[in-house]
């Protein structure tokens, strides 16, 4: 997991700009690349997991085609490579984008080509990619792209956010900055799809989720586990133990500790400090439902205090397998997966966790597991994740199996009507003042 800026034919010096997102990397120094013939600049901070050797982890790699890779491809060895960086770049150069359907992980890849900078995002936008529409520039976060020129407030985006909590589109708070949709690439400002779910090969759900968990335990840094006491994280924890692996389970103190201790007594119970509205807006960089952002920020901060750079969670299961109450009334899966996840939940999780240099790994969001959910008829998904309960009942204590969903909340972090008005004012002052 890393951070980057890439640009072509601009007057900006990326050497100075990249330091504004230095928190996205750790354990390796910034390294830049400039191609004066093409007018290309690439800047990158690395958070290595696969190989901690600075000569291997720091990008751009001098031994590879000028490019930047952000994310993780967990099955790179299975695909015949020594690192996931080499896997992503060489797969693109030798086999093209269609070969990305073999990847298990999440990624953003930027490649310097004769036609221009190509920016590629993963199947669901787990690693968000942003670009400017008026200059050739891309980055891991939208805020840094404001430095390439004036920006105009997108009032439609803001109105949607105030109404729904997020904007279900590639728009951002600024008209000149957009997000690349999941499974798409951008070249010269033109965005095109490359991902086809029909090309994802999967087997049975239990096998594929187990494989996803095993893959996400990899790397040379310890991986922690967020154990909420709910169904999704309990399933993930159960598969970790079935694989014979040890993992540090962390529970956020929200009154659900008794359920988490039904899963394991070996638990770190942490209390979350409050997060100011101003900090939440500054970290998230765009207006959003801050009621969910604030506890996520507090959790990421606590993980770093405990010394972890990666955390495994049950994120994605609700959207995929009908975990929300609305799923019993109508089939919202498509909008939940392809609007709410890539344009609300995943950018929120990326920014809040990476601000504290923490990589989030969600086994439910592997391509194979997602395809299972997409192929499952509504009747089998309807009713509080019925398919998950039937498939993994042996891993889940009875009280958890039959309880209703509870969101991540704490007594210290709630949003009152008065606070919501403060949020609105803070958003305006921070973004458009």
Model features per residue range: what roles?
Residues 326, 396-432:
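PAPS-dependent sulfotransferase catalytic core
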Residues 29, 33, 83, 385-391, ...:
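Polar, surface-exposed loop/tail segments
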Residues 8-10, 115-118, 198-395, 413:
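ATP-dependent adenylate-handling active sites, centered on carboxylate activation for C-N bond formation
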Residues 1-270, 274-279, 283:
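Cysteine-centered catalytic environments shared across enzyme families
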């Amino acid at each position: 997991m890393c951070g980057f800026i890439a640009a072509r034919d601009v007057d900006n010096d990326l050497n100075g700009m990249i330091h504004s997102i230095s928190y996205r990397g750790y354990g390796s120094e910034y390294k830049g690349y400039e191609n004066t013939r093409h007018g290309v600049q690439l800047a990158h901070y690395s958070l290595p997991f696969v190989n901690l050797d600075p000569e291997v982890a720091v990008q751009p790699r001098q031994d590879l085609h000028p490019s930047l890779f952000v994310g993780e491809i967990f099955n790179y060895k299975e695909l015949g490579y020594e690192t996931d960086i080499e896997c992503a770049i060489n797969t693109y150069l030798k086999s093209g984008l269609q070969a990305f359907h073999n990847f298990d992980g999440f990624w953003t890849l930027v490649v310097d080509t004769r036609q221009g900078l190509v920016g590629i995002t993963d199947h669901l936008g787990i690693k968000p990619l942003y670009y400017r529409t008026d200059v050739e520039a891309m980055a891991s976060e939208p805020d840094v792209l404001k430095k390439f020129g004036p920006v105009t407030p997108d009032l439609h985006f803001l109105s949607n956010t105030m109404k729904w909590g997020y904007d279900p589109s590639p728009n951002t708070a600024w008209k000149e900055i957009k997000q690349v949709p999941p499974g798409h690439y951008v070249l010269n400002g033109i965005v095109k799809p490359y991902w086809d779910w029909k090309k994802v090969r999967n087997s049975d759900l239990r096998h594929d989720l187990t494989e996803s968990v095993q893959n996400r335990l990899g790397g040379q840094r310890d991986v922690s586990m967020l154990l909420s006491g709910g169904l999704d994280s309990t399933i993930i924890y159960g598969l970790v133990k079935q694989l014979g692996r040890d993992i540090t389970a962390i529970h956020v103190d929200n009154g659900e500790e008794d359920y988490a201790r039904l899963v394991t007594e070996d638990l770190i119970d942490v209390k979350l400090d409050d997060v100011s509205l101003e900090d939440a807006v500054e970290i998230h960089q765009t207006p959003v439902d801050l009621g969910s952002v604030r506890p996520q920020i507090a959790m990421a901060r606590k993980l770093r205090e405990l010394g972890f750079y990666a955390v495994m969670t049950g994120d994605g299961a609700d959207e995929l397998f009908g975990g929300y109450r609305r799923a019993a009334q109508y089939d919202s899966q498509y909008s939940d997966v392809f609007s709410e996840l890539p344009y609300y939940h995943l950018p929120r999780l990326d920014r809040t966790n990476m601000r504290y240099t923490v990589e989030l790994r969600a086994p439910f969001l592997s391509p194979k597991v997602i395809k299972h959910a997409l192929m499952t008829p509504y009747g089998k998904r309807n009713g509080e994740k019925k398919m998950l309960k039937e498939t993994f009942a042996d891993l889940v204590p009875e009280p958890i199996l039959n309880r209703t969903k509870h969101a991540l909340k704490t007594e210290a972090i709630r949003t009152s009507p008065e606070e919501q008005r403060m949020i609105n004012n803070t958003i305006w002052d921070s973004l458009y003042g």
